[in-house]
Swiss-Prot record:
<feature type="binding site">
    <location>
        <begin position="1329"/>
        <end position="1337"/>
    </location>
    <ligand>
        <name>ATP</name>
    </ligand>
</feature>
<feature type="region of interest" description="Disordered">
    <location>
        <begin position="455"/>
        <end position="555"/>
    </location>
</feature>
<keyword id="KW-0547">Nucleotide-binding</keyword>
<feature type="compositionally biased region" description="Low complexity">
    <location>
        <begin position="19"/>
        <end position="28"/>
    </location>
</feature>
<feature type="domain" description="Protein kinase">
    <location>
        <begin position="1323"/>
        <end position="1596"/>
    </location>
</feature>
<feature type="compositionally biased region" description="Polar residues">
    <location>
        <begin position="1199"/>
        <end position="1208"/>
    </location>
</feature>
<keyword id="KW-0808">Transferase</keyword>
<feature type="compositionally biased region" description="Basic and acidic residues">
    <location>
        <begin position="524"/>
        <end position="533"/>
    </location>
</feature>
<feature type="binding site">
    <location>
        <position position="1352"/>
    </location>
    <ligand>
        <name>ATP</name>
    </ligand>
</feature>
<protein>
    <recommendedName>
        <fullName>Mitogen-activated protein kinase kinae kinase bck1</fullName>
        <ecNumber>2.7.11.24</ecNumber>
    </recommendedName>
</protein>
<feature type="compositionally biased region" description="Polar residues">
    <location>
        <begin position="1257"/>
        <end position="1272"/>
    </location>
</feature>
<feature type="compositionally biased region" description="Basic and acidic residues">
    <location>
        <begin position="1189"/>
        <end position="1198"/>
    </location>
</feature>
<feature type="region of interest" description="Disordered">
    <location>
        <begin position="211"/>
        <end position="253"/>
    </location>
</feature>
<feature type="compositionally biased region" description="Polar residues">
    <location>
        <begin position="535"/>
        <end position="555"/>
    </location>
</feature>
<dbReference type="InterPro" id="IPR008271">
    <property type="entry name" value="Ser/Thr_kinase_AS"/>
</dbReference>
<dbReference type="InterPro" id="IPR011009">
    <property type="entry name" value="Kinase-like_dom_sf"/>
</dbReference>
<feature type="compositionally biased region" description="Polar residues">
    <location>
        <begin position="220"/>
        <end position="248"/>
    </location>
</feature>
């Protein structure tokens, strides 16, 4: 019989007519003895009467005859054709009439080629199994476990399909014939071979062993279930069609398919396999059923009907998705289609696959527990012959050889897929046994099945249904919880690989991949054994498939069901469960399977591998895994994981699947991290690498995050900030393998009792009680995470602790619950390892990461620690990347300036001066220096407005401290003998330079000098300068000293006053004065930058004052350093809001606002550094600049070193005068002489730029304003100083640096002894306030007279200059022309040109500063103007335009953006970049080119054609400006440039006046625009001139009642600041 079965499996060469040979072949087979017909469980249709063609029993031939097509033959080739009457079994429905005869060459992909071709006359099956007390299976009479050797099995395998059908048709097991008819038969009733009674699908199955496998009881059950809607897991039989059948659909003929797969069953199948309602509606609409349905997955070519899917199904599906509101997701639906094809292919392989068995259930049920006998008798009892895995090879000798012989079958198209094994399968299997009347099932098998968890029972449907052969002996293995699918295990184990389904059965979602497909078949294996062992493929097929690694998982796709994915994931967590993606899973016998299932699995042996499904029939696990991947494991309703971390380094995996309540979730997370007080812990969303966490998650957000972000791959990552992880500071945290300390037993929740702490005797003794009893979540109990300790940073390594084969959570739980001795031993070792890890972690954390728990004692007043807390020493904050700047009462000092070349020279000069003995008494209080040193240079420099600036000791030897406020120096100052000379005060760390200076004076001083120099290199220079200055204050030179004192010792808010005080006061009195006026500080830093001069900070600056004018040179240096370090210095030049946005370039503050906010507009300038001559307030006009040559001379002397940023020049010279003398070892008298020179004969102190600017502003207010059309209420107009012909030096700070740090401001120095003939103006450039076509406009201030002006700078790219010299020359010439043209213009409505400065690659034009903004910017910002404003502005513009035309100047670019509007309502024409001077202003000049802005151009400019144009183009542009002011937008606002050019040039059209404008403005205004827009036909003479419009047009009449200050526009623009 084995041989016969083999023959049955071996497809006979197709006879001329497949029907006849197959029938004859079937006829040759003796029908099995009639058996009592089992009731048709699960709605199985009663066996149909014998098929109309009274032919041979349903054997391969029968099927062939029915299929009568090449497909059938191919399937026969697959090897399923002959072997099994599965077709009959799989069909619960009446078999369709046999198809026309065809050659029975249906070999399943040549699977049976290894077998000898059975005789056509020979019976497909040698005999029919007679059910016995120990048999099971619907009508199959499957022998009891280990009874495979019974001839009945063999006979059963050879039974004709009709015979089987008779019995099986009634059984719960549905044949996977694809018809969906559950030919579930009583296991006790042998099917009667009858082609008639067998459904066409059965015949097909005969041809296709896979189909037959589906017809196995399991398959039948499935099919039937699918039809009946029951959840019983029918076994699937691989479709031969999938393999090689060309004519067979799903292993059945079209007629069989129609019977097996009616539309209802198709829809049910779709629903059970998780396809959306859109898919169901699509199939319903398209009436896809029967052969059409099966054809989708396995067409005639064995690949599936892609055309139908893409041309019909997907278009209709898209419509359904849109109609249902789901939305068409092409990628998703393509994936679904792919999954569907795989599932249908599995149906072909195992017809019962789809039958109403949810993939999830199947998976669960199919997975037999590892090492346990198959829970389903079907599995264990299925004869090997029934399927590749059906019987153990041992049971059926034929199986072994065939398996080996048919390995090629595994290469069949069948893909092994991880299929969810419906839990119902096991249930179904048990149900089948009952329903089918399979009392024959042995009690042992039944007990085994019962023992298996539903999940574990999950059998490989392919095995149960397709192969129908389950090795009974392997039941024990199936029981093994680790075998996800008993069948799979058997089959896959044989191959050495078990699908993830073979993994622990404990995991519901066992992976039923290729291997799993075996497992799925295994499930069917139970069923098939139960219901249709007759349909089992020949053992050969089974063996071959399994050995080949082919897994005919009935549910390759089903496994991909959501639940399957979940199952897989859960298993995946377990080391024993390979992830579905494991490629090794493809082979049922892959080592993975063996590993997971262990040697106990039934299929570890080749014989066991023989399952009903041939490996070839089974879809490869790879395909299954692919499907699962495609499907997305998240779809599994499995575990949800979250990564939680205490330190952002080490993450704990927490199972939050069942954490429905927020409290439970928080507790679980905190317990896993070892946080005892979970209620007070804060949880934040985080991502790897994230360090800052803003808001902790509240309960609502935490629950939302859990729902939306948690998944099986741990996408949800949480950062937990606990209060006290380890309540006992001395307690050494226990570490789980992850390196996370475990909470103490008392701190951990009961669930955390797992012995994760270091296992000492006590811990070991606690292990038994520790089993968590119902922890909120297994993880909680399982994994108490250690509290956030240093160790927490290390990646958790407890994972090893989890028992193998369990998910970490499970492992923990088990450990806690029942630690075995060996486990305890293991835990002990782990604990030892943990201790080591903990130690390392502590070391690591101590060096990196959050600070470790404080060891300090905590008292009522807070933490206390031993030792002295030095508040001067800032503690390092873990939250700061860089050391915070030392806190000081004043502004932060900028970083110490780098010593520039100038400073170097100055230093050298100063050194020389320092080398000179100073008059200062050598007696210097070391205490002062020491104190200052202890305070730190920053403290000394910044801590006090004026760090002690001891005045040089008076001649009497008294040391005058220049107000070192609060510094020890002052105290010393009081005692002149103690206080060191100014140098000494310089000795203070704050005054490094002073130290240097003192260095020469006394050795003590030099040391401090060195220190100070280290800290302040540049200060040293200043100090030296101060030293020299100090010399001048030497006691010997009382006058100098006094002058020095006046300059440095006594900080005065008023420079003059300070000067006076300095002159009069003694050193001590000066120090006192300083004390009185702490606001005044000497800006040594600025001095440093100047290099030559010492500058004082005005009280407003409140920067550290120099300790001493003379001796404080070093102190000044420190002070200057501090001043340089002042926040102003450090602060990046802020761009004022008014200049920050391009739309308000013109929103410039009035001059008063600029003066009041000089620091904002000149951020890099030390405005308080005294650098101007002390002649008094320099008048706003150039005369101030024209300082007497003496002053210049004196400045020159002082300024070489001091030349500050221009601001500090004169005063710096004065202040630095002392220093300068140091540079120029001239003695203290030099300072006095310099002062005298500056003042023109008397000692004076320099003025700061701020003072000069304020004085100029006040003077301008006090004097009458000379403005052409001054209006009431308009702001006073300044007459700016013309600088043409004068020498202009522009001083601009380098980006990010204070001007004081730059080279000294050039001083108005004239050669000594030579009178200064040419006035020199030093212009300090400030903020950018505008951008133009040809350059940028900066705010500027005349350092000599305090006037505010605008600096228009045009820079030429040096590269461009080198490449295009001609262009550069042309540009320069144009600029020169503009300057020459405009320098003499002076009109209240024209921006004044004040001067220019030419550089090698730039030209700077100095213009009158106009506050407010351009009319264009105001329009854009505030909208259109009211008519009264437009009228006034038009009149003013015409006035300026008439003046220009009178001067022979064409503006040629008149537009709103080029008319500036002052805050007083005065407008001024600006931007003469393309203006042109001509003799005949109103005569057309052919040389005039097309210049200007298109939208404001006159037609003649565009149409010039050599005729040229006159100044009347400006009148046209003025009309455009008026229209622009009325409309609030540019002319031709609806046209692009090209359109405007066309209409102007070709049509000579004027810009249209919008209706909203024409309807609201006065007729005079409208007439004015029309007059301006006069289009010249021959020339522009018809257009009025500016003077005509100004004097004669009614719109330009002056309104005596108009006051700009009362207009809405003024209200909008007045708040510029």
């Amino acid at each position: 019989m084995d041989g016969q079965r083999q023959q049955t499996y071996i497809p006979a060469p197709p006879p001329p007519s497949a029907t006849q040979p197959s029938q004859s072949h079937m006829l040759s087979l003796p029908p099995p003895p009639p058996r009592h017909l089992p009731t048709q469980p699960q709605g199985v249709m009663p066996p149909p009467p014998p098929g109309p063609p009274p032919g041979p029993p349903p054997g391969p031939g029968y099927g062939a005859s029915k299929l009568a097509n090449s497909q059938l033959q191919q399937q026969n080739n697959l090897g399923w054709q002959h072997n099994w009457a599965r077709q009959a079994l799989s069909q619960g429905f009446l078999p369709p009439p046999p198809p026309p005869p065809m050659v029975p060459t249906n070999q399943a992909y040549g699977r049976q080629t290894s077998f000898s071709v059975p005789n056509a006359d020979g019976p497909i099956t040698s005999a029919t199994y007679v059910p016995g007390s120990n048999t099971f299976g619907a009508g199959v009479g499957i022998p009891g476990f280990d009874a495979h050797t019974r001839p009945s099995y063999e006979a059963y395998g050879t039974m004709s399909g009709s015979d089987r059908i008779r019995g099986p048709v009634h059984h719960l097991y549905e044949s996977s014939g694809g018809d969906g008819s559950a030919y579930k038969r009583d296991g006790t009733v042998p099917p009667t071979p009858s082609a008639r009674t067998m459904p066409s699908s059965l015949a097909l199955h005969d041809n296709a062993q896979e189909s037959v496998a589906s017809s196995l009881p399991g398959a039948t059950a499935q099919n039937h279930q699918s039809q009946t809607g029951q959840t019983n897991e029918p076994t699937k039989s691989p479709s031969h069609r999938q393999n090689n059948s060309n004519t067979l659909l799903g292993g059945m003929s079209p007629s069989e398919a129609a019977v097996q797969w009616p539309l209802d069953r198709v829809l049910l199948w779709l629903a059970k396999n998780g396809f959306s309602r859109d898919w169901q509606e699509t199939f319903k609409t398209l009436q896809i059923e029967g052969a059409d349905f099966l054809d989708i997955g396995h067409g005639a070519n064995g690949r599936g009907n892609f055309n139908k899917m893409h041309n019909e199904v997907f278009p209709q599906l898209a419509k359904e998705c849109e109609a249902s509101g789901t939305g068409w997701d092409k990628e998703r639906e393509l994936g679904e289609g792919k999954r569907m094809r795989r599932l249908i292919r599995q149906i072909h392989d195992d017809d019962s696959f789809d039958v109403g068995i949810p993939a999830q259930k199947r998976r669960e049920s199919q997975a037999p527990s590892e090492g346990a006998p198959d829970t389903s008798p079907k599995l264990s009892h299925e004869p090997q012959s029934a399927g590749p895995h059906s019987g153990t090879i041992e049971n059926s000798p034929n199986l072994r050889a065939p398996q080996l012989a048919q390995p090629h079958r595994h290469s069949v198209q069948m893909r092994s897929v991880t299929l969810p094994i419906p839990t119902t399968h096991d249930i179904a299997s048990s149900d089948f046994s009952q329903k089918d009347g399979i009392s024959s099932r042995s009690d042992f098998s039944r007990s085994v099945l019962v023992g298996l968890g539903v999940d574990h029972r999950r059998q490989s449907p392919s095995m149960s249904s397709d192969n129908g052969n389950l090795v009974a002996p392997f039941r024990s293995y199936e029981d093994s919880p680790k075998s996800g699918s008993p069948a799979t295990q058997h089959a896959t184990l044989n191959q050495g690989l078990s699908s993830s389904s073979t993994g622990d059965l404990s995991v519901k979602y066992e992976h039923s991949r290729g291997n799993s497909s075996d497992s799925t078949m295994g499930r069917r294996y139970y069923e098939s054994r139960k219901g249709q062992e007759t349909i089992r493929p020949s053992p050969q097929e089974m063996c071959s498939r399994q050995w080949t690694g082919e897994t005919s998982s009935s549910y390759p796709k089903e496994h991909k069901g959501i639940f399957n994915f979940l199952k897989k994931r859960s298993k995946g967590g377990d080391s024993t469960h390979p992830s579905p993606e494991e490629p090794n899973l493809e082979s049922p016998t892959s080592p993975v399977n063996l590993r997971q299932n262990g040697p106990h699995l039934p299929y570890t042996k080749p014989s066991f591998n023989a399952s009903d499904m041939s490996l070839g029939e089974r879809p490869s696990s790879a395909s299954m895994s692919d499907h699962e991947r495609l499907r997305g494991k998240p779809a599994q309703k499995g575990k949800k994981w979250s990564f939680v971390t205490l330190d952002g380094w080490n993450y704990r995996l927490v199972d939050i699947t069942d954490m429905d309540s927020v409290e439970t979730l928080r507790a679980a997370i905190c317990h896993n991290l070892g946080i005892a007080d979970w209620a007070s812990a804060q949880i934040f969303l985080t991502e790897p690498g994230q360090s800052d966490h803003e808001e902790p998650l509240n309960d609502t957000m935490l629950a939302l995050c859990r729902r939306t972000k948690s998944d099986s791959i741990g996408s949800l990552k949480l950062f937990v900030r606990g209060t006290h992880l380890q309540p006992v500071p001395n307690h050494v945290p226990n570490f789980a393998g992850l390196g996370v300390p475990l909470p103490d037993k008392h701190t951990a929740s009961p669930t955390h009792h797992l012995p994760r702490k270091p296992l000492d005797d006590e811990a070991l003794s606690r292990i038994p009680p520790q089993p968590q009893t119902g922890p909120a979540s297994p993880q909680l109990g399982i994994r108490p995470q250690q509290p956030k300790t240093p160790a927490a940073k290390f990646p958790a390594r407890d994972a090893p602790q989890h028992t193998e084969g369990m998910s970490p959570v499970e492992g923990d739980q088990q450990v806690g619950i029942s630690p075995e001795p060996d486990k305890a031993d293991l835990l002990a070792r782990h604990e030892e390892h943990k201790r080591e890890v903990e130690r390392k972690q502590k070391a690591y954390l101590s060096s990196k990461g959050p600070p470790q728990p404080r060891n300090d004692s905590y008292g009522e007043t807070g933490y206390r620690r031993a030792g002295v807390i030095d508040f001067d020493e800032r503690r390092v904050s873990p939250y700061e990347d860089k050391k915070a700047d030392t806190l000081v009462p004043l502004r932060k000092p900028p970083s110490a300036p780098q010593e520039s070349y100038t400073l170097t020279r100055i230093n050298s000069l100063r050194k020389k001066d320092g080398d000179r003995p100073r008059a200062q008494p050598a007696v210097q209080t070391h205490g002062l220096g020491a104190v200052l040193a202890s305070m730190g240079r920053m403290t000394s420099a910044i801590g006090t407005p004026a760090p002690s600036v001891p005045t040089p000791t008076s001649a009497g030897g008294k040391q005058t401290n220049f107000g070192s406020f609060g510094s020890p120096t002052q105290g010393n100052t009081k005692s002149a003998p103690q206080s060191s000379p100014e140098k000494e005060s310089l000795d203070n760390p704050g005054n490094p330079a002073e130290h240097r200076h003192t260095k020469s004076t006394a050795p003590e001083i030099p040391k401090p000098t060195l220190q100070s120099r280290k800290s302040y290199g540049p200060e040293f220079d200043f100090e030296e300068t101060e030293v020299s200055f100090q010399r001048s204050p030497r006691p010997q030179d009382d006058s100098d000293e006094d002058s020095d004192d006046g300059l440095f010792a006594i900080p005065l808010s008023n420079n003059k006053a300070s000067t006076k005080e300095n002159d009069s006061g003694s050193g001590t009195s000066e120090a006192q004065k300083r004390t009185e006026k702490p606001a005044l500080t000497v800006n040594t830093e600025s001095r440093l930058r100047k290099g030559l001069s010492v500058s004082f900070r005005s009280p407003s600056a409140t920067r550290e004052s120099f300790a001493d004018a003379n001796g404080d040179s070093g102190g000044r240096e420190g002070a200057s350093f501090l001043m340089a370090a002042s926040p102003e210095d450090e602060r990046p030049p802020p761009r004022r809001d008014s200049f920050a946005r391009g739309d308000i370039w013109a929103s410039r503050p009035p001059v008063e606002g600029v003066i009041d906010n000089l620091d904002d507009f000149f951020p890099d300038i030390d405005l308080d550094a005294p650098y101007l001559d002390g002649q008094g307030v320099s008048p706003p006009s150039s005369p101030a600049n024209r300082a007497p040559p003496e002053n210049d001379l004196h400045k020159k002397e002082n300024q070489p070193s001091s030349s500050y940023t221009g601001e500090m020049n004169a005063n710096a010279g004065d202040t630095l005068g002392s220093n300068e003398p140091t540079l120029k070892p001239q003695g203290g008298d030099v300072v006095a002489r310099r002062n005298i020179n500056r003042s023109g004969g008397g000692l004076t102190r320099g003025k700061s730029i701020r003072e000069v600017a304020k004085g100029a502003n006040q003077a301008s207010r006090s004097r009458s304003i000379h403005t052409g059309n001054q209006k009431s209420g308009e702001i006073l107009r300044r007459k700016s100083t013309k600088m043409f012909g004068a020498k202009i030096m522009q001083i601009k700070p380098k980006p990010g640096s204070r001007l004081s740090q730059l080279d000294p401001i050039p001083q108005n120095n004239t050669p000594s002894g030579v009178p200064q003939r040419q006035p020199t103006f030093r212009i300090i450039r400030g903020q950018l306030i505008g951008k133009g076509t040809y350059g940028r406009v900066y705010l500027g201030i005349n350092a000599d007279n305090g006037e505010v002006l605008a600096v228009k700078q045009v820079e030429i790219n040096p590269r461009l200059a080198g490449q295009d010299t001609d262009r550069v020359k042309e540009m320069v010439a144009a600029m020169d022309q503009e300057i020459d043209t405009m320098q003499h213009l002076e009109h209240p409505n024209i921006v004044q040109y004040l001067g220019c400065e030419r550089g090698e690659f730039s030209i700077s034009i100095y213009l009158e500063y106009i506050s407010g903004g351009s009319i264009g910017s105001c329009l854009r910002k505030h909208g259109k103007f009211e008519e009264s404003v437009v009228k006034s502005l038009t009149r003013q513009t015409l006035s300026g335009l008439a003046y220009l035309h009178d001067q022979g100047i064409l503006h040629r670019d008149l537009k709103a953006d080029n008319i500036l509007l002052d805050l007083d309502g005065t407008c001024k024409i600006s931007d003469f970049g393309i203006s042109k001077k001509t003799d005949d202003i109103y005569g057309n000049d052919s040389s005039n080119s097309m210049q200007g802005s298109v939208f404001w151009m006159a037609p003649e400019v565009i149409q010039s054609q050599g005729q040229g144009y006159s100044a009347k183009v400006d009148i046209w542009s003025l009309g455009c400006v008026v229209l622009e002011m009325f409309a609030g937008r540019r002319p031709w606002s609806k046209e692009e440039a090209i359109g405007a050019i066309f209409k102007l040039g070709s049509l000579s059209q004027a810009p249209p006046i919008p209706d909203d404008v024409s309807m609201t403005i006065s007729p005079a205004a409208l007439a004015f625009m029309y007059d301006c827009f006069t289009v010249p036909y021959r020339d522009s003479s018809e257009r009025p001139t500016a003077q005509t419009l100004l004097t004669r047009h009614p719109f330009c009449e002056e309104d005596p009642n108009y006051n700009f200050l009362d207009t809405e526009l003024y209200a909008k623009i007045r708040h510029v600041l």
